[in-house]
C-alpha cells in the first residue's frame, strides 16, 4: 500500500512510479501515485481531523509526538538502512540523520513554549493578550537529500501547534516517507492527523492547489519552489514558507591558519553527501599568491583521494552517488558548460557506474559572467581574488543567499565579512554544512522567503491572535461627532 489517508493504507490510482537505488539502479520500491481526487480525499481527512486535534490539550499532542520519537529510536538502524538504499549516502551518514529525526523533536517542543505561548501586557487601559492559534491543514513537501530528518522538522512543529498535515515525500524517496508514516501509526496518531500522499509532479501540483490547504511548508530545489511561488500568486489566503537552495560562497583568506585543517573544512563543505546539501559550498574564493597556490595544490591532492563507494561498503566511503542518473548527468553537463566558457578543470568530475560522479574542481577565474546556478552535486568552482573586499563583492554576485563562509584567523577580516556578506547562514572557520536546529535556517533572495525549520518553524505553524480586553464597556466623556445617546 502506498498512501495513508484517513487512517487507512490505500493503493494509488495514478501512474506507477518506482524508487531506484542510485548505486546499482535496482528497484527498491514500487507504487502508484495519488490522483488529484485522492489528494482531495487526504486534504478532506486532515480538515475533518483538525476539528478535534486542535482541541486536544498540548500535553496530549506532545505525548503522541514523544511516542513517535521513541519509535524512531527503536527503529533507527532500519531507518538509516532505508535512507542509505534510497539516497546512496554512506550508512554512517544516514545513521546521523536517523538520530536527528528523534533528537530535534526536543527543539520543536521547546520552541512551542518559547514562541507560541501566551503573553499579557497593559496598554491605554486595556489588557492585551497575545495568543497563538493553529493555521489548519498544512501541506508538507519533503526533499530527497534528507528524506527523514527535514520533513520531520516541519511535521512535528505543525502537529504540536494543533495543525493537521498532508505529507508528500519526494518521488525519489517514497520508501522513507512510507516508513515514517508507519511509525506515526504505531505511535497512536489519530486518524487523519497526518495523511501521506505519494507521487511525482502531478501529485504535488494537486496538493498545492487543494482548496482545503491553509499553508505549505516546502523544502526542495529553487526551481520547484519558484513554481509553487507562482502557483500561490492567485491564492493569497494560504501561507507559503519556502526553504530552497543556494549558490554558496566560501572565502579563504591569506590568514587561513593550518593548511590541512583548511583543506579538510573545504572538502566537508563541498563534497559531503556527494555535494547534495543545500548549504554545500559551490564557489571557493582563494587569494592569489603562494599561500593560495599551496592551498589549491593540497586541495586537489586530497580530493583525488576521496573514497567513493556504495553506502554499506568497507572500508567506509566518504561519499556515494548522486540521487539519480539524471542528477549525475546534470553535474557533468554543468562541468562541460563551464569548460566551454573558459573554465579549467583542476580535477575533472567523471561518471561512474549507475549514478556515481567523482568530485570535480574547476578554476573559473577567467569566466567573466559565471552562471548563477545551484550545481547540486560534487562540482566546486574556484575563483582567485585579490583583496577581501573584492572577494566579498564576487561572493555576493548571486540571486541566492543561503549560506556563506570565511576561513580566517583575523578578527577584523571576520567583522568585515559578516557585515558585508549577503547570506542567511554565515560560518567562520567551520564547514558550511551542518546548521543548528536552534538557529534560523534559510536565506534571502532565491533561497527562500521564511525560516520554517526546527525551532523557528513554530512561527509559521500558528498565527498570533491579539485580544484587547477591557474590564467593562465604558462611555467616554466626549462622544464622537454626530453621535447622540
Swiss-Prot record:
The UniProt entry, under InterPro entries, shows: Ald_DH/histidinol_DH, Ald_DH_C, Ald_DH_CS_CYS, Ald_DH_CS_GLU, Ald_DH_N, Aldehyde_DH_dom, SuccinylGlu_semiald_DH_AstD
What's the EC number here? 1.2.1.71
According to the UniProt entry, where is the signal peptide? none
Keywords (alphabetical) are: Arginine metabolism, NAD, Oxidoreductase
Q: Which residues cross the membrane?
A: none
A Pfam family that the UniProt record links to this protein:
Aldedh
Under which main EC class is this enzyme filed? oxidoreductase
This protein's pathway reads: Amino-acid degradation; L-arginine degradation via AST pathway; L-glutamate and succinate from L-arginine: step 4/5
Q: Supply one GO molecular-function term.
A: succinylglutamate-semialdehyde dehydrogenase activity
The record lists NAD(+) as bound by 220-225
Listed under catalytic activity are: N-succinyl-L-glutamate 5-semialdehyde + NAD(+) + H2O = N-succinyl-L-glutamate + NADH + 2 H(+)
Which BP terms from GO are recorded? arginine catabolic process to glutamate; arginine catabolic process to succinate
- The active site lies at 243, 278
**CDD domains, alphabetized:** ALDH_SGSD_AstD (cd07095)
HAMAP family xrefs: Aldedh_AstD (MF_01174)
Homology family: Belongs to the aldehyde dehydrogenase family. AstD subfamily.
Q: What does this protein do?
A: Catalyzes the NAD-dependent reduction of succinylglutamate semialdehyde into succinylglutamate.
Name of the featured protein: N-succinylglutamate 5-semialdehyde dehydrogenase
Species per Swiss-Prot/TrEMBL record: Vibrio parahaemolyticus serotype O3:K6 (strain RIMD 2210633)
Amino acid at each position: 500500500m502506498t498512501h495513508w489517508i484517513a487512517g487507512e493504507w490505500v493503493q494509488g490510482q495514478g501512474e506507477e512510479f518506482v524508487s531506484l537505488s542510485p548505486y546499482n539502479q535496482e528497484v527498491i520500491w514500487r507504487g502508484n501515485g495519488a490522483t488529484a481526487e485522492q489528494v482531495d480525499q487526504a486534504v478532506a481527512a486532515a480538515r475533518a481531523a483538525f476539528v478535534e486535534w486542535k482541541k486536544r490539550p498540548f500535553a496530549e499532542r506532545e505525548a503522541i509526538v514523544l511516542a513517535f520519537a521513541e519509535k524512531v529510536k527503536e527503529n533507527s538502524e532500519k531507518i538509516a538502512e532505508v535512507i542509505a538504499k534510497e539516497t546512496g549516502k554512506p550508512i554512517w551518514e544516514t545513521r546521523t540523520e536517523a538520530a536527528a529525526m528523534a533528537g530535534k523533536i526536543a527543539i520543536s517542543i521547546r520552541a512551542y513554549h518559547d514562541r507560541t505561548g501566551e503573553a499579557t501586557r497593559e496598554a491605554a487601559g486595556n489588557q492585551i493578550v497575545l495568543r497563538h492559534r493553529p493555521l489548519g491543514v498544512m501541506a508538507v513537501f519533503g526533499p530527497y537529500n534528507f528524506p527523514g530528518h527535514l520533513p520531520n522538522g516541519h511535521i512535528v512543529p505543525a502537529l504540536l501547534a494543533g495543525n493537521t498535515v498532508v505529507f508528500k515525500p519526494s518521488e525519489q524517496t517514497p520508501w522513507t516517507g512510507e516508513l515514517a508514516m508507519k511509525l506515526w501509526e504505531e505511535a497512536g496518531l489519530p486518524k487523519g492527523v497526518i495523511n501521506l500522499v505519494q507521487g511525482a509532479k502531478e501529485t504535488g501540483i494537486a496538493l498545492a492547489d487543494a482548496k482545503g490547504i491553509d499553508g505549505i511548508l516546502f523544502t526542495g530545489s529553487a526551481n520547484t519552489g519558484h513554481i509553487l511561488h507562482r502557483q500561490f500568486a492567485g491564492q493569497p489566503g494560504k501561507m507559503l514558507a519556502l526553504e530552497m537552495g543556494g549558490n554558496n560562497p566560501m572565502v579563504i583568506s591569506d590568514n587561513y591558519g593550518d593548511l590541512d585543517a583548511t583543506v579538510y573544512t573545504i572538502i566537508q563543505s563541498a563534497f559531503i553527501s556527494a555535494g547534495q546539501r543545500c548549504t554545500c559550498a559551490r564557489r571557493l574564493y582563494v587569494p592569489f599568491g603562494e599561500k593560495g597556490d599551496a592551498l589549491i595544490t593540497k586541495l586537489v591532492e586530497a580530493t583525488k583521494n576521496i573514497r567513493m563507494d556504495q553506502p554499506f561498503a568497507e572500508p567506509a566511503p566518504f561519499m556515494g552517488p548522486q540521487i539519480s542518473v539524471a542528477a549525475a548527468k546534470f553535474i557533468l553537463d554543468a562541468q562541460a558548460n563551464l569548460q566551454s566558457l573558459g573554465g579549467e578543470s583542476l580535477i575533472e568530475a567523471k561518471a561512474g557506474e549507475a549514478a556515481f560522479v567523482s568530485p570535480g574542481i574547476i578554476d573559473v577565474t577567467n569566466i567573466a559572467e559565471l552562471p548563477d546556478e545551484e550545481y547540486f552535486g560534487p562540482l566546486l568552482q574556484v575563483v582567485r581574488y585579490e583583496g577581501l573586499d573584492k572577494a566579498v563583492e564576487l561572493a555576493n554576485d548571486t540571486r541566492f543567499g543561503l549560506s556563506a563562509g570565511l576561513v580566517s584567523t583575523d578578527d577584523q577580516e571576520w567583522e568585515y565579512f559578516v557585515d558585508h556578506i549577503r547570506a542567511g547562514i554565515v560560518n567562520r572557520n567551520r564547514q558550511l554544512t551542518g546548521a543548528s536546529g536552534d538557529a534560523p535556517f534559510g536565506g534571502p533572495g532565491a533561497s527562500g522567503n521564511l525560516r520554517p525549520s526546527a525551532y523557528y518553524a513554530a512561527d509559521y505553524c500558528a498565527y498570533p491572535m491579539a485580544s484587547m480586553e477591557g474590564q467593562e464597556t465604558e462611555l467616554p466623556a466626549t462622544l464622537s461627532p454626530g453621535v447622540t445617546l
